[in-house]
Amino acid sequence: MGPRILIHADLGRVEWRDSLPSCQRLAELIGWELVIVRRQAGDLMHRWETRWERNVARYATLECVQVILPWSTPSMRFCTSEAKTKVIASALAKRFPGQPILNVTGIRREESATRRAKPVCAIDSNLATGRREALVWNPIIEWPIEQVWRTIAAAGLTHEAYAVYGSTRVSCVFCIMSSIGDLRAAASCPDNHDIYRAMVDLEARSTFAFQGNRWLADTAPHLLDADMRRAVTRARLAAHERMRLEALLPRHLLYVKGWPTTVPSDEDAELLASIRRRVSALLGIDADYLTGPAVRERYRDLIAAKPERIAVP
């Protein structure tokens, strides 16, 4: 039997304040070392903020045709892959070089359709290499939620998210997968008010709701001052207009894997330029390529720069 550790990926401001102490209580109870890892480039809120800044810059230089949202989504969960999975795998690989690793998780089939299909045990693709065997083991995958609650309560390891505030799950305080009830539960905790306001501010600046069509701002509007409520109202209107305008874009003007596939006609280029002018004004983006000829020239330049050249008319 090799060394055993607990490992926790700290997500920073978006995490429940009781999450790290809960891990520490568990480590003390079972007598294992607790290893805490963090994304070196910044916490998850920083990731969303910088993603938005970069997406604005990409739109300004016509590196993308439509404005790209700042948030993670259920189909694009870089929050999990970058802030949890990768940093945990990296820490384990450095700590146990060349040694076999058994990675034990607490996922359960009841949690989602994806997890319902997970095996009890499998090769851990994030850790396994030609020189290292690695398995991921999901020992409680069949457990119903009631058994989870009983086990936690018996160990005296309850978490404030559900014990105090009534959340049905412990994740980021405001998670892209959260129900409206869990979002409200998180907002009822005073510790979460600052991050709530920061996330609503990003909704307002970006014109993208946190969960598709569900605005986080609607969860606890009483926590927002008058200026922020007005900013959210403007953002909703701008979002509706942005989506209406972008729906006018012909599909052949959209990029495929980040690259244009054809140079637009004069008519299409003028249409795209017109949409870019209006969207840029809505979002306050200082964009280039706002005339038809400039758009055509930009497409030509990008096509010329693409590794596999496309015939330019």
Enumerate the language-model features and the residues they cover:
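Nucleotide-activated chemistry modules centered on ATP-dependent adenylation/adenylyltransferase
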Residues: 1-313
